[in-house]
Amino acid sequence: MTISRTCIPAEFHTMSAAKRKVKRLVNNYARCPDAGEGEEQTLMALVTTEKMLKDAQAGHYAVGAFNVENLEFVMAVLAAAEETKSPVIMQTTPGTIKTAGLDYFYGMVKAAAERASVPVALHLDHGDGYDRCMQAFRTGYTSVMIDGSHESFEDNIALTKSVADAGRAMGVPVEAELGKVGGKEDDGPAVEGESPYTDPAEAKEFVERTGCTSLAIGVGTSHGVYTSDPHIEQSVVKAIRDAVDVPLVLHGTSGVPDEQVAEAVKNGICKVNYATELRQAYTKGFMAYMAENPACFDPKKPAKEGMREITELVKIRMTNLNSVGKAE
């Protein structure tokens, strides 16, 4: 079977060879493996987060970004997105990547996107340096985050701008972080004892000087498991929304009451990250099955229960973010 030119966007034919190579890397245009002889079909390829988040910003909803740990997580999150007809972002942290590598996770999520009826983006969460982000670009990730929040304001700007410039050249959006989201993200340093809020004036300057396409802000949330009642400072969300025009991102959302998250979305949050509670849900389902079936040695059986727990949780989160039906 030959690949028809109708499977490829018109602008692709007029690009330089270098730009075509970049476009292939980002959008992964390919033929459908299930197409019969003589049939022409285009895969639902991975998409970037740029249009996804701009649509959310215009429509006053948020896209859920879910950290995936393995194939079961990918399949479970996609099942929820399909059922709710929601756009979805799957993301991996450097800590998760250490278990297999960028290419393994890219392969899994790319395969999921090709079978999906909803938009799927693959995002590098908390990119821990310029080199890591370049590796993600080269692998085919369609969105990256550079986390310079532990640096000084000026050093964060310099680092973020270097990655944002590279992302712009490759057509890949770049998320940055300004302010301190508390707790500990995977293998990253713990953040304690600092102001949890991003300054709106600094946010405006930061976005203008770096060219980042979305911004994760500190509004009182924390990574990991909360040891006290979480609280989102909605006035900070509103002030930053008024100060910048790029989509805003909320980290450390696992365990935050739904009503607080929903209000933050109404106030301008466009992307909401979830990680810890997916791990908890999967482990809950897996361990419950093993407790009832201690002689089981087929990992697919307890994994199925873990996947079911994730799917149900993600459906609830997507409903709360008001993203249901936005992929139709």
Regions of interest found by a model, annotated:
Residues 2-7, 16:
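Alpha-helix boundary/capping motif
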Residues 257-328:
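C-terminal alpha-helical cap/extension of soluble enzyme domains
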Residues 62-67, 88-91, 120-125, 144-146, ...:
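Hydrophobic faces of well-ordered beta-strands that scaffold small-molecule active sites
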Residues 11-14, 20-43:
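Short, Lys/Arg-enriched N-terminal segments with co-localized hydrophobic residues
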Residues 49-53, 71-91, 95, 105-116, ...:
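Alpha/beta enzyme core
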Residues 96-98, 151-153, 278-283:
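Short gly/pro/ser/thr-enriched loop/turn and capping motifs at secondary-structure boundaries
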Residues 43-64:
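N-terminal amphipathic alpha-helix/helix-capping segment at the start of soluble metabolic enzymes
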